[in-house]
């Protein structure tokens, strides 16, 4: 293995000569097919643990490296954590955490090249033999891009962190505080990895007196628009909610369709009202989130019948920078009412036109928009039925947990469907709730000493590196993708988090997040990761110069400046 060394570049900067070693680590990791929720997650943790255990430092200090199982997980998965204690004179307990996930999304999109998806060199050769979009062709032939699942998202980021762990294990005398390496599983689905790792970080804080000063996440960055040449670093991260709508109508035989109300009509109007709606973009610190978009829209009929559906179910991705879960519920109740009114207006207009053509006399339409949050519905049912309702629903939830085919989203829908049966008033309605965990927003503004020090360290690092790199390195406030950054710091207050829990039917059974553990860690975090394009797509690729050389050096400088003084 290549010995970590320094490369002197123009100016007064000294940069780590790290490209070959980070490339070596990246290829090792990419070649392990570690798709989320598969055995591969376990395999990559074993390999990574074995690799780190071969470093001389960890042979001397084996207790500084752990392979830690995830908690309350139906799968046998592990995180890998390691730390180096600095021995530089004047060192303190200040500790920086390097974070990266080792799982990937699936490889079905690689179609005929699926067997090469995790073999970067072979994949590149195969891609060059087929028609490619112009930009992809240019990158494939340049020699400066690595293709393959996980090359960008985010095994090259983990490789960068691994390089720094190895470097400081060889040079602890250059480290003024402590360095923690965390490679977690399950980032691409439910964040069980990072949520489990909170316990290990807490334990090390107690045992080794670590004072967690900052965290650097190494997830990928990408162009924000066509022709964008910037390489971005992000302070904090976007938050993500999954607002969901259980919609009931009035069932009828399709031969008497105007005697009922199809919930799919309301669902369609709801999607028309919410999908891509710029009014639902959240602006903060001069940045704007992407608008919501639907991730599922269906009725809940299990089989074909000629009766209209009893209920429909839709949910939407929803990003936030400053809005709380309570804010989003209020906002979407208004949107749901607009959609309901639009659906009834369209229904009336078409009903009257039909009656004119058929020679029928239209009846008066009695339905009115009716919107309830899950918490409001539960409050009504607890008041009406008390313990009877509570005991029945707890038993129902327990029985649902036995069905492994239900993810948290469909589990939540079934709970709402069951609760709906208890309501005396069965007139058409929309029940609004959350059906997945809330990934909290993180806002890093310099509001305390730790945030201010991290921001100053980042600014200084970019200023020093920029003369050695031709592309602009730009710092922005919010990482625009979902990441595990959401679970190392927290910007929401307890009331906001309570709104997310109280309106989540799966909370406490299928889903639980210990936000108190996140708040206990509450370390300011930035994202400084590899650059590339087409993450989660078959042309996923990582630009090597920035990712393998600039990123490790930037992270090293941030680490150094956070810990010094």
Which residues does each predicted region cover?
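Midchain, well-structured core segments that form catalytic/ion-binding scaffolds
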Residues: 203-409, 413-414
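Short glycine/proline-enriched loop/turn "hinge" motifs that connect secondary-structure elements
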Residues: 172-174, 234-240, 304-310, 422-425, ...
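Acidic/His- and Gly-rich active-site-bordering loop/insert found
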Residues: 6-147, 170-177
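A glycine-centered beta->alpha junction motif in the catalytic cores
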Residues: 104, 245-252, 529-537
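A generic structural motif
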Residues: 36, 187, 251-254, 318-326, ...
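Short glycine/serine- and small hydrophobic-enriched flexible loop segments
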Residues: 162-170, 269-276, 556-560
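An extended, acidic, His-containing surface patch that forms the Zn2+-binding/catalytic region
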Residues: 44-45, 61, 352-565
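Acidic/histidine-rich catalytic neighborhood of metal-dependent amide-processing enzymes
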Residues: 145-236
């Amino acid at each position: 293995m290549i010995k970590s060394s320094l490369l002197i570049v123009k100016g007064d900067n000294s940069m780590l000569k790290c490209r070959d070693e980070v490339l070596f680590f990246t290829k090792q990791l990419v070649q392990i097919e570690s798709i989320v929720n598969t055995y591969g997650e376990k395999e990559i943790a074993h390999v990574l643990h074995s690799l780190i255990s071969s470093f001389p430092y960890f042979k001397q200090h084996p207790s500084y490296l752990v392979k830690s199982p995830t908690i309350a997980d139906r799968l046998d998965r592990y995180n890998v954590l390691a730390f180096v204690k600095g021995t530089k004179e004047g060192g303190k307990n200040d500790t920086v955490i390097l974070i990266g996930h080792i799982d990937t999304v699936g490889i079905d999109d690689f179609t005929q090249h699926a067997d090469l998806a995790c073999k970067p060199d072979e994949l590149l050769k195969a891609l060059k033999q087929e028609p490619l979009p112009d930009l992809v062709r240019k990158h494939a032939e340049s020699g400066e891009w690595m293709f393959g699942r996980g090359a960008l998202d985010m095994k090259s980021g983990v490789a960068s962190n691994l390089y720094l762990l190895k470097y400081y294990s060889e040079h602890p005398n250059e480290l003024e505080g402590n360095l923690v390496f965390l490679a977690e599983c399950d980032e691409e689905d439910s964040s069980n990895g990072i949520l489990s790792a909170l316990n290990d970080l807490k334990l090390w804080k107690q045992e080794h007196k670590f004072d967690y000063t900052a965290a650097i996440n190494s997830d990928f960055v990408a162009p924000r628009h066509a022709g964008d040449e910037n390489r971005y670093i992000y302070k904090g991260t976007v938050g993500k909610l999954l607002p969901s709508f259980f919609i009931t109508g009035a069932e009828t035989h399709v031969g008497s369709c105007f005697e009922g109300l199809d919930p799919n009509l309301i669902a369609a109007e709801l999607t028309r009202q919410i999908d891509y709606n710029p009014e639902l973009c959240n602006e903060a610190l001069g940045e704007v989130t992407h608008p919501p978009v639907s991730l599922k829209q269906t009725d809940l009929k299990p089989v074909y019948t000629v009766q209209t559906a009893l209920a429909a179910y839709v949910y939407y991705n929803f990003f936030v920078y400053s809005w709380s879960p309570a804010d989003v519920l209020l906002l979407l109740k208004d949107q749901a009412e607009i959609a309901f009114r639009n659906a009834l207006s369209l229904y009336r207009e078409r009903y009257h036109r039909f009656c004119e053509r058929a020679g029928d006399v239209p009846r008066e339409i009695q339905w009115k928009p009716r919107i309830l949050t899950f918490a409001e519905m539960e409050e009504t049912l607890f008041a009406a039925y008390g313990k009877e309702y509570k005991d029945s629903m707890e038993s129902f939830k327990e029985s649902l947990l036995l069905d492994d085919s239900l993810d948290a989203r469909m589990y939540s829908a079934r709970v709402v469907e069951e609760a709906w049966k208890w309501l005396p008033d069965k007139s058409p309605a929309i029940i609004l709730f959350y059906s997945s965990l809330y990934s909290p927003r993180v806002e890093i503004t310099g509001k305390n000493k730790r945030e201010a020090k991290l921001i100053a360290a980042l600014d200084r690092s970019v200023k020093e590196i920029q003369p050695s790199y031709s592309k602009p390195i730009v710092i922005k406030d919010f990482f625009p993708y979902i990441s595990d950054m959401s679970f190392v710091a927290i910007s929401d207050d307890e009331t906001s988090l309570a709104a997310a829990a109280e309106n989540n039917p799966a909370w406490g059974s299928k889903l639980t997040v210990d936000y108190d553990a996140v708040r206990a860690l509450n370390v300011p975090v930035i994202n400084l990761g590899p650059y590339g394009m087409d993450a989660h797509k078959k042309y996923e690729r990582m630009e090597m110069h920035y990712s393998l050389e600039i990123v490790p050096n930037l992270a090293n400088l941030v680490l150094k400046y956070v810990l010094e003084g």
